[in-house]
Swiss-Prot record:
It is found in: Secreted. Keywords: Disulfide bond, Ion channel impairing toxin, Neurotoxin, Potassium channel impairing toxin, Secreted, Toxin, Voltage-gated potassium channel impairing toxin. Belongs to the short scorpion toxin superfamily. Potassium channel inhibitor family. Alpha-KTx 03 subfamily. Gene3D superfamilies: Knottin, scorpion toxin-like. This is Potassium channel toxin alpha-KTx 3.17. Completely inhibits the (125)I-kaliotoxin binding on rat brain synaptosomes with high-affinity (IC(50)=0.1 nM). Is a potent Kv1.3/KCNA3 ligand. Expressed by the venom gland. One of its GO terms (molecular function) is toxin activity. Its main location: secreted. Pfam families: Toxin_2 (PF00451). Disulfide bonds join 8-28, 14-33, 18-35. One of its GO terms (cellular component) is extracellular region.
Amino acid sequence: GVPINVKCSGSRDCLEPCKKAGMRFGKCINRKCHCTPK
């Protein structure tokens, strides 16, 4: 995935930030969001 500078406590926290970044899916890795490009 593509790491973005958004802190998270769970993958759910990354859904919106990833959408806003123009990507989909979000996983929380090491307390940061990682998104999957479209």
